[in-house]
Amino acid sequence: MDTGVIEGGLNVTLTIRLLMHGKEVGSIIGKKGESVKKMREESGARINISEGNCPERIITLAGPTNAIFKAFAMIIDKLEEDISSSMTNSTAASRPPVTLRLVVPASQCGSLIGKGGCKIKEIRESTGAQVQVAGDMLPNSTERAITIAGIPQSIIECVKQICVVMLETLSQSPPKGVTIPYRPKPSSSPVIFAGGQDRYSTGSDSASFPHTTPSMCLNPDLEGPPLEAYTIQGQYAIPQPDLTKLHQLAMQQSHFPMTHGNTGFSGIESSSPEVKGYWGLDASAQTTSHELTIPNDLIGCIIGRQGAKINEIRQMSGAQIKIANPVEGSTDRQVTITGSAASISLAQYLINVRLSSETGGMGSS
């Protein structure tokens, strides 16, 4: 593969996102941030590191290609140093390879793997690096992890070739829709379920109201501020700031705010059932029904794979949700939500989260 397109200073601003564990990130940051500061100054690349209360963190490198790969090489060298240090008093017979994970849009993985795996095989053979593309997307995102292992130079060459493939794919067929970036979850985050009970999430599952942007490997603005929510066992939960706001609204029996802006979906913003009390406490509330109209091309994100998402929404809200069969000639599907006013409101909220994540319609509060 010709990596001259990278070596020759291609006129693009490249962004590489790495997924690392906290200990690795700590080493890269260094004492009082001295190590990462040195990397920034010597490479000329922008190096951003996601918030520190997560077991996993995203390191984003952005800038001209020569700056990016200089910073990348410095990170690889640092990881290599850490392995050498750990081997000093070790009785292990073999030295482990440097291993890292790239985070890339799932839409690019097909081109990267190639027909029958030919492209990924070519990259492995030409660079000597071990490369594995994850089969599943990272939680609550449209991105996958690519694990690369080997000696430093092999890894650097491998990442260059991966970027070349992605650049070529972009130039031939620009992506459709948005990329929902992966956001590692905090290790302990207050959440609330229907019924009012507080919990703290400590597992590996999380959900986010992501900063959605039509970004690929080349977007320098990928690290925008997220709007976060958290999950336990894969179920949506309401973040604490929103919880306080919604609790106040419930006490005032005011209308539930469905969106931060106009979604264009009939029945979602215009219809807001009154919240009659704190969620889950009014078990004897009168059962009512509410109908939504959702475009056919978005109904899939509400249903989820094998109905997983719609079942989450049902369990979280306590509402019954029925999606009508498609009607010939119609571009919309009818969704009927039945339950108490509070459960309907929560179901609407969760549906709107799914739609906003899919379309990028969620603004900042």
Curated annotation (Swiss-Prot):
There is a cross-link at K115, K185, K322 (Glycyl lysine isopeptide (Lys-Gly) (interchain with G-Cter in SUMO2)). The modification Phosphoserine is found at S173, S189, S272, S364, S365. Phosphorylated. The non-phosphorylated form(s) exhibited the strongest poly(rC)-binding activity. (Microbial infection) Proteolytically cleaved by picornavirus proteinase 3CD. Keywords: Antiviral defense, Cytoplasm, DNA-binding, Host-virus interaction, Immunity, Innate immunity, Isopeptide bond, Nucleus, Phosphoprotein, Repeat, Ribonucleoprotein, RNA-binding, Ubl conjugation, Viral RNA replication. The record marks Q253, S254 as: Cleavage, by viral proteinase 3CD. It comes from the Eukaryota. One of its GO terms (molecular function) is ubiquitin protein ligase binding. CDD domains: KH-I_PCBP1_2_rpt1, KH-I_PCBP1_2_rpt2, KH-I_PCBP1_2_rpt3. One of its GO terms (biological process) is viral RNA genome replication. Detected in all tissues examined. Single-stranded nucleic acid binding protein that binds preferentially to oligo dC. Major cellular poly(rC)-binding protein. Also binds poly(rU). Acts as a negative regulator of antiviral signaling. Negatively regulates cellular antiviral responses mediated by MAVS signaling. It acts as an adapter between MAVS and the E3 ubiquitin ligase ITCH, therefore triggering MAVS ubiquitination and degradation. Negativeley regulates the cGAS-STING pathway via interaction with CGAS, preventing the formation of liquid-like droplets in which CGAS is activated. (Microbial infection) In case of infection by poliovirus, binds to the viral internal ribosome entry site (IRES) and stimulates the IRES-mediated translation. Also plays a role in initiation of viral RNA replication in concert with the viral protein 3CD. Identified in a mRNP complex, at least composed of DHX9, DDX3X, ELAVL1, HNRNPU, IGF2BP1, ILF3, PABPC1, PCBP2, PTBP2, STAU1, STAU2, SYNCRIP and YBX1. Interacts with IFIH1 and RNF135. Interacts with MAVS (via C-terminus) and ITCH (via WW domains). Interacts with CGAS; preventing the formation of liquid-like droplets in which CGAS is activated. This is Poly(rC)-binding protein 2. It comes from Homo sapiens (Human). The lineage of its organism: Eukaryota, Metazoa, Chordata, Craniata, Vertebrata.
